[in-house]
Amino acid sequence: MAESIEMGEELVSSPSTLLALKGKLENPSPDDATILGILGKKTPTVKMEKGKGKGDPIEAFLLEFVDERRQVEANKRLRQYIRQLKMSHQEELTAHLERASAENRANLKSMMESQAESNKTTKTILATLITLRDHVIEEGSKKPRGLDKDQIKLERALGFERGYSSAIAIVNQLKVTEPSQVCKPSVRAAALSAMEKGEFESSGEVFKAVVKRAKAELTK
C-alpha cells in the first residue's frame, strides 16, 4: 500500500512521466486499449444507410447539426410530419375541388337548360317564318280571277240600285213634285258609266255621278 502511494507520488511529481501517460491514453496500443477497456466501452453509433440522403437537404441538415445516433429517428419523425402536412393540404384541396366541381356542374346545367329554351324559341320563329314565306309564295303564284257574267250583272244591278235610290232621296230632299224629272235614261246612263269606270266596286263614284246628273236634270 505504501509502495503504491509512493509510486503514484513519483508519477505525479515527474512531468515526463505524465506526458508519456497522456500519449498512451490518446493513442493506445491494442494491448493497452484492451487493458483499459476503451474498445469494449465505446458508445455504439447508428450509421446512415449508404447513399441515403444524398442530395436531400433535410438529411444534409440532420447530418450537419444532429448527433449521428439520433439522425434516423429525427429523419423519420420529420418525414412523418411532412406527410401529415401534405395529407392535410390534400384534403383541403380535394374539398375545394369538389365544391368547385359542383358549382361548375350546376352552372353547366343552367346553361344547357337556357340553351334548350333558346333553341326551342328559335325553332318556333323559324317555323313561323317558313309558314309566312310559303303563304306569300302561294299567294303570289295565284292569278286574279275575273268576274263572271252573272257577277257583272249583279254588280251592275246593285250599283244602279244604289245610284237610283240616292237620286230619289235627293228628289225627296229637294221636294221635287215629279220624280220622273230625275229618273230619266240620262241618270241611268250616268250610273252605269260610273260603275264601268269603278270596275263594279266603287259605289262612291256611282253615287257622285248619279247626284251630279240628277241635279243637272233638276236645273233644266
UniProtKB/Swiss-Prot annotation:
Q: Which UniProt keywords apply?
A: Chaperone, Host cytoplasm, Phosphoprotein, Viral RNA replication, Virion
Assign the protein's first listed, main location to one coarse class: virion
After translation, the protein is modified as follows: Phosphorylated by host kinases.
Where in or outside the cell?
Answer: Virion; Host cytoplasm
Which Pfam families does the annotation name? Rhabdo_M1
Entry's Gene Ontology cellular component terms: host cell cytoplasm; virion component
InterPro entries found in the cross-reference section: Rhabdo_M1
Assembly mode? Homotrimer when phosphorylated. This trimer is stabilized by binding to the L protein. Binds soluble protein N, and ribonucleocapsid.
Q: Please identify the protein, giving its name as recorded.
A: Phosphoprotein
The species this protein belongs to is Snakehead rhabdovirus
